Amino acid sequence: VTQAMLWSEKTVVFDMDGTLVDTAPDLHAALCHAFSTQGMEAIDLPTLRSTIGHGARAMIEKSAAELKIELTANQLETLHLAFLDYYRANMTVHTRLFDGMDETLNFCLERDAKMAICTNKTQALAEQVLSELNLSDKFVAVLGADKTSEKKPSAVHLKETVSLAKGKIDQAVMIGD
C-alpha cells in the first residue's frame, strides 16, 4: 500500500478565517467602516482577532461589548448591513493565505486527498474569498454557516462538510476550529 493510496481515502477539512487565510485585516477594515457610519470607533486589529470565527454579527456584538457600547437591535442590524456591504466589495484587499498554507494545500493535493472548507462565513462570502484568491479549484466542497443544519462548533457542520466532499468521517481530519 502506497502513501498516495492512503491519502486518497482522506478528507482534509480546513477552517477558513484564522486558519487557512488571514482575513483579519479586511474584516477589521469592514468593521471600522461600519462603526464609522454610526459615529463610533471600532476596536483595534489585535483585539478583533479574538472575536473572529462565529460570523459577522457575533463579531460586531463582541466588538461593541469590548468598547462597552450597548447596541439596540436596530443599531446591530444597521452595523451588520454596513459591514457586509463594505466587506463584499473589499474582502481580499489584504487577505492572504497564512505562511505555509500554500505548501500544505499542495502537499494534500499531490497525494490526492480530498480537501474541503468548513466555515462560519456564509457560503457566498466563503466562495468569493476562495475565488478571489484563486483557490476554488483546490477544494471539492465548501460548506458555509448558512448551508449547514448546525454551524461550528457543532460537529454536525464538520460531518456535513465531509459528506458533501463524499468522504468518510473516520477518514477525515479537521485543521482549525
Model-derived features with residue positions:
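Short, acidic loop-to-helix structural element flanking the phosphoryl-transfer center
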Residues: T2, L6-E9, R88-I117, Q123-E127, ...
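Active-site neighborhood of HAD-like aspartate-dependent phosphohydrolases
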Residues: T2-S50
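Hydrophobic "anchor" residues on beta-strands that sit immediately upstream
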Residues: T11-V13, A116, V173
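An amphipathic alpha-helix signature
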Residues: H28, C32, L45, G53-E61, ...
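A metal-dependent, Asp-based hydrolase signature
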Residues: H54-A89, D99, F107
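Substrate-recognition "cap/lid" segment bordering the active-site pocket of phosphatases
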Residues: V93-R96, T122-I175
